[in-house]
Amino acid sequence: MVRNIVVETMKRSPFTETEVEIVERKGVGHPDSLADGIAESVSRALCREYIERFGRILHHNTDEVQIVAGESRPEFGGGEVIRPIYILVTGRATAYVGDEEIPVGTIALEAATEYLEETVRHLDTEKHVVIEPKIGHGSADLRDVFERGEEVPLANDTSFGVGYAPLTTTERLVYETERKINSPKLKKDLPEVGEDVKVMALREDNKIELTVAAAMVSQRIDDIDHYISVVEELRDRVADLAAEIASDHDVEVHVNTADDYERESVYLTVTGTSAEQGDDGSVGRGNRVNGLITPFRPMSMEAAAGKNPVNHVGKLYNVLAHQMAREIYEETSADEVYVRLLSQIGHPIDDPKAVDVHLVGDVSEEDERVARRVADELLENITELTERIVEGEIEVF
């Protein structure tokens, strides 16, 4: 097969030489990330059920999850949730095969509950949350497209995916900061810190200002002095991480900058997530498939979480574009690599309408040949992504 792969060389300075950069990551306990996580966990659970029953994944998309914030009354040493968080799990799934019924609603409820229990330590899914699955049937034409792709799945949409490599120092710092704050080790050392974490970085030349918003768990904090000590300790740990990752940058760390210590108006929550009061969440409003929000870099607005991992190019092409960019970067002398993939509905996913690869820097003709080869090989094996996504080896937010 001869694929439409175009490799272009861009003679310009790499992005790291720009004066300004902004990067954001919403942590796993942020309402938007919780919506993503629930959507993806439901999709994976359905995939496993379909495989167990029928030996293959059936048509579904569960990429519509809405979190409606509850109401809470946090206070030092305690607090309560007085109106639960409402979570609506919608989408489409195959509920019948012949006369056999698949309990789609039950699977969705169990998957969402399990995900919340694993992700937000202080969230009581029996008291603090109401989960309502409302998953319907997919349209006949898209189910038909799904079923027709026996050897290679057929694209369910005309859509595009974008990716780039490598990550900048600022991007790595933002990603790793959230991962560290939500790591088991930090939660053991500082159990007062909740899972709802948001990290924003502004780089101006060589200076990075890192702003962290971290929900604190009220029942674990005795008073304002205790709260302040936790914030200061968290700031120190983030600063230590920044010294490792961004040693050649001047990094300034801020934590919970909206706090007013004199009025004791601080970021307290009962559960560790702002979804308990005042902050709603939706699939696709947060991190892109590389775990970041990067307004200075190419991004797709596609909500990848919850989409089926078989033929939904909105998911597969964004994952593949980043993988393709990384591997091309590793195998060539390019300073940066940018990849764009375009599908056409009804056509095999391994044969995109267009593959556009940009190599930035002083590259050779051999580098261009390598880029084409890597792109071609990854497209040839695109169906391998499905199992890796189902097994949770690939994250999409």
From Swiss-Prot:
Record's catalysed reaction(s): L-methionine + ATP + H2O = S-adenosyl-L-methionine + phosphate + diphosphate
Q: What is the species of this protein?
A: Methanopyrus kandleri (strain AV19 / DSM 6324 / JCM 9639 / NBRC 100938)
Print the organism lineage: Archaea, Methanobacteriati, Methanobacteriota, Methanomada group, Methanopyri
Q: Which cofactor does it need?
A: Mg(2+)
Q: What is its EC number?
A: 2.5.1.6
Pfam families in the cross-refs:
AdoMet_Synthase (PF01941)
What this chain does, per the entry, is described as: Catalyzes the formation of S-adenosylmethionine from methionine and ATP.
Per UniProt, ATP binds at: G136, H137, G138, S139, A140, D141
EC main group: transferase
Q: Does the keyword ATP-binding apply?
A: yes
Any single GO molecular-function term of the entry would be:
methionine adenosyltransferase activity
Q: Which family does it belong to?
A: Belongs to the AdoMet synthase 2 family.
**BP GO annotations:** one-carbon metabolic process; S-adenosylmethionine biosynthetic process
Q: Which NCBIfam families match?
A: PRK04439.1-3, PRK04439.1-5
Which pathway is this protein assigned to? Amino-acid biosynthesis; S-adenosyl-L-methionine biosynthesis; S-adenosyl-L-methionine from L-methionine: step 1/1
This protein is called: S-adenosylmethionine synthase
Q: Does the keyword Magnesium apply?
A: yes
In the UniProt record, the gene name given for this protein reads: mat
For this UniProt record, the keywords arranged alphabetically read as follows: ATP-binding, Magnesium, Nucleotide-binding, One-carbon metabolism, Transferase
